[in-house]
Every structure is written in C-alpha cells, then in structure tokens.
C-alpha cells in the first residue's frame, strides 16, 4: 500500500510541474501552466479556467523532441491541451486522499 501511495505522489507531482519541462498541467497552478487550453468557453471568453487539468505531452506528435517534451501551450493542440473529465476526475480523487 505504501508503494502505491508513493506512486500516486510521483504522478501528482508530475502533473503539478515536477516533470521534464517544469510545467504544471493544471491551469492556474504554479508559475508555468497552460494558458491556452482547448476549452470552448475559456477560448471564447479569453479566461484561464483555473484548476483544470490538461492532457500534457503527446508522444505521438511528430517532432524531434523526446516524447515527454512534446507539449505545446496552444489551444488548437487538443491532444496536449484539452480539458477532459477523464483527466480531471482522477486528479480530484487522488488529491482528496492526501488530506
């Protein structure tokens, strides 16, 4: 159980900015975070949807960069910057365990 808990901490740290590009994938969290998320309401109103988790790096994007660095803060890049319930609900579940 302790090993699993440590694994969850590492995964959460990676989403919050302890990763190869030093970027938080939760908008509004940290100093470097997604500002151009793929979310229709946020795009139209030009607001930062604080607390939303985006997908992060996409190893399938054609680039010379290593897979963990294939991330662009661009609202047209839905594979890296989309806000989806299947990203955000597990994050809420894991963070609730850290109380």
What does each of the following model-derived ranges do?
Residues 1-99:
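Aromatic (Trp/Tyr) and acidic
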